[in-house]
């Protein structure tokens, strides 16, 4: 295309009496003439304010879309009508440019004098008729618009939305801005200031409650006659809900309400809404808001989805913390609370800054708990909707493998419901966890009542699962020793639950599993349990090794057997031979005739020997090979 189309081309392609604007009006059902005049006046005002008439319509696609979005939002049309409003703005831009070519001297004089009133009036008188707009605009396809990245769009936006003086020469001729180093800094500053003004305007809408909460509640697609019925049927019946807003693109009003009320009462948010200059002075507040949101996301994943494999947890966390999802979170939180469409504003410059500033402001004013708990409920709802497979896995029982993460089921659902494979119960478990919860009573919903019993005495405790980690066996035993005044140090105790001996791992699983049932623990003596059991926890005192001298019913076994064909004494014979080789000297006859009966009689005469440790043998080369001339007693009883 070598140049702009001539006026003759427009007249040839024109349908007599029925232009493109008239077709678009019929398509939009825009038949109210009074309202149409208001629309035309507002359209020309925006075109002149942002100087869209200085360039061809094909060169400023992004600017036309933004002006069309403003007009569509102000006149209450849905997003589906965006293309029609873009065509109306495009037609108006071309009409204005043609009218200025016809009266170049008059427009140049008006611009030089700095008065735009006569200009607007002359434009309004010529651009509202269908004869001045070619129907080729209506038939224009999207292929006419050159694709551009976000950076290119931002650069184009910064070049087009500049003050008029930056494009005007001394003789009144308008030149496009050249992307030189000298002109880029004012352009970027002006563009960034416009973004700051948009953020300030949106915060002002939230603080002043432009859209009343009652109106937002009425428009909430989640509103139903019965919350319990909704909790069990919303996930499976989402397509049946009659609403123009997709369910998965919104957040229930009862989850957003607490944050919106805090924003209205926030002093910091009010200061931001009244900021006249740059909002860069709130840079640290943005960091506070961003870190708070990321912390809330990590808390939700660790709190409700810790039974998933680490790669899945890492993936969900990374996707939820991505700028795209955070921008979507900003739209879901504040989209219904303002008259402007947040989806048409830049994500990095407007949507994310709005989210960070508002969350940082209410965290500064009200603290972490009143802010992060409602925010965590919203994030939990979004994760449940976006990742239904993860939510179903969160309802499954944990694997018995010790390498798996401990399951943490929802606090309001008992274990028998979680083990049920019924979809209705699983959906109920999923939805009930998103119910609002007061920050000051957050721990009350996840407390666990623990009852510890020792003999005929018992003591009840309250275990806070959110703020405390699971105790170890030794910690519980040490506290119970002081609680129940256990002074007998000769007995070894263990912790039992449902007649099962607990170790540190099983005790942690018991305390980490969220349920409304009580935990009953019993302190018992474990001295009768075989020591070979590898699951026996470390007791208060180490278990005492029993010896042969403490068992009077055991027969006396000589060190050197008199009869070699006795099978019961063969095991000690090999043991004696080893001791003889260690001592490096043959044992005397009197030592070889010494039997364990001597040790048995000695232990019977001294009742305190079983309370003391058995001395280790001391090997020498004299005829008294062992201490006190006695043989050592074996540590473990032989299996005869």
UniProtKB/Swiss-Prot annotation:
GO terms for cellular component: cytoplasm; nucleus. Keywords: Cytoplasm, DNA-binding, Nucleus, Phosphoprotein, Transcription, Transcription regulation. One of its GO terms (biological process) is positive regulation of transcription by RNA polymerase II. It is found in: Cytoplasm; Nucleus. Residues 118-139, 580-640 are annotated as: Disordered. InterPro entries: TF_Vhr (IPR007147). The modification Phosphoserine is found at residue 409. It comes from the Eukaryota. Induction: By stress, probably through the induction by the transcription factor PDR1. Transcription factor that binds to the VHRE consensus sequence in promoters of VHT1 and BIO5, and regulates their biotin-dependent expression. Present with 279 molecules/cell in log phase SD medium. This is Transcription factor VHR1. It comes from Saccharomyces cerevisiae (strain ATCC 204508 / S288c) (Baker's yeast). The lineage of its organism: Eukaryota, Fungi, Dikarya, Ascomycota, Saccharomycotina. The gene is VHR1.
């Amino acid at each position: 295309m070598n140049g702009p189309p001539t006026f003759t081309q427009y007249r040839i392609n024109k349908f007599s009496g029925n232009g493109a604007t008239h077709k678009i009006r019929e398509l939009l059902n825009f038949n109210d003439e009074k309202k149409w005049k208001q629309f035309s006046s507002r359209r020309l005002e925006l075109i002149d304010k942002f100087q869209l008439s200085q360039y061809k319509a094909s060169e400023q696609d992004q600017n036309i879309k933004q002006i069309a979005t403003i007009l569509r939002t102000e006149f209450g049309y849905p997003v589906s009508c965006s293309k029609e409003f873009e065509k109306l703005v495009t037609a108006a831009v071309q009409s204005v440019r043609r009218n200025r070519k016809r009266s170049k001297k008059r427009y140049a004089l008006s611009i030089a004098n700095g008065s735009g009133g006569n200009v607007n009036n002359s434009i309004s008188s010529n651009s509202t008729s269908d004869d001045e707009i070619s129907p080729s605009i209506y038939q224009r396809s999207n292929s006419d618009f050159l694709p551009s990245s976000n950076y290119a769009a931002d650069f184009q936006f910064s070049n087009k939305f500049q003050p008029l003086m930056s494009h005007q020469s001394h003789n009144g001729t308008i030149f496009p801005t050249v992307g030189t180093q000298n002109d880029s800094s004012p352009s970027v500053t002006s563009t960034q200031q416009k973004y700051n003004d948009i953020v300030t305007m949106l915060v002002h809408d939230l603080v002043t409650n432009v859209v009343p909460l009652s109106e937002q509640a009425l428009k909430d697609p989640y509103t139903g006659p019965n919350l319990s019925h909704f909790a069990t049927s919303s996930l499976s019946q989402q397509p049946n809900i009659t609403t123009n807003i997709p369910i998965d693109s919104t957040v229930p009003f009862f989850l957003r309400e607490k944050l919106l009320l805090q924003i209205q009462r926030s002093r910091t948010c009010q200061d931001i809404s009244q900021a006249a200059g740059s909002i860069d002075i709130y840079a640290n507040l943005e960091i506070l808001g961003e870190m708070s949101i990321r912390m809330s996301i990590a808390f939700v994943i660790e709190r409700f989805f810790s039974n998933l494999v680490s790669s899945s947890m890492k993936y969900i966390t990374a996707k939820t913390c991505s700028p795209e999802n955070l921008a979507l979170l900003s739209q879901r939180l504040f989209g219904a609370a303002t008259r402007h469409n947040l989806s048409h504003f830049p994500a990095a410059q407007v949507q994310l800054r709005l989210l960070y500033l508002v969350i940082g402001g209410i965290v500064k004013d009200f603290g972490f708990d009143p802010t992060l708990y409602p925010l965590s409920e919203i994030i939990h709802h979004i994760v449940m909707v976006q990742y239904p497979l993860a939510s179903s896995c969160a309802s499954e029982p944990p694997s018995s493998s010790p390498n798996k993460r401990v399951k943490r089921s929802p606090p309001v659902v008992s274990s028998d419901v979680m083990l049920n494979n019924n979809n209705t119960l699983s959906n109920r478990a999923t939805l009930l966890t998103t119910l609002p919860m007061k920050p000051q009573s957050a721990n009350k919903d996840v407390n666990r009542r623990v009852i510890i019993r020792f003999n005929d005495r018992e003591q009840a405790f309250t275990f806070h699962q959110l703020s405390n980690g699971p105790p170890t066996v030794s910690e519980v035993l040490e506290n119970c020793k002081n609680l129940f005044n256990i002074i007998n140090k000769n007995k070894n105790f263990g912790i039992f639950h449902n007649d099962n001996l607990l170790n540190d791992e099983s005790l942690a699983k018991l305390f980490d599993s969220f349920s409304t049932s009580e935990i009953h623990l019993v302190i018992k003596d474990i001295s009768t349990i075989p020591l070979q059991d590898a699951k026996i926890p470390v007791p208060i005192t180490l278990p005492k090794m029993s010896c042969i001298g403490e068992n009077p019913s055991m027969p006396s076994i000589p060190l050197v057997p008199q009869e070699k064909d006795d099978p019961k004494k063969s095991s000690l014979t090999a043991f004696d031979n080893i001791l003889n080789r260690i001592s490096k000297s043959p044992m005397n006859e009197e030592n070889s005739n010494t039997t364990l009966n001597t040790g048995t009689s000695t232990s019977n005469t001294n009742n305190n020997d079983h309370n003391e440790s058995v001395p280790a043998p001391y090997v020498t080369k004299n005829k008294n090979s062992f201490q006190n001339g006695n043989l050592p007693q074996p540590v473990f009883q032989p299996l005869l």
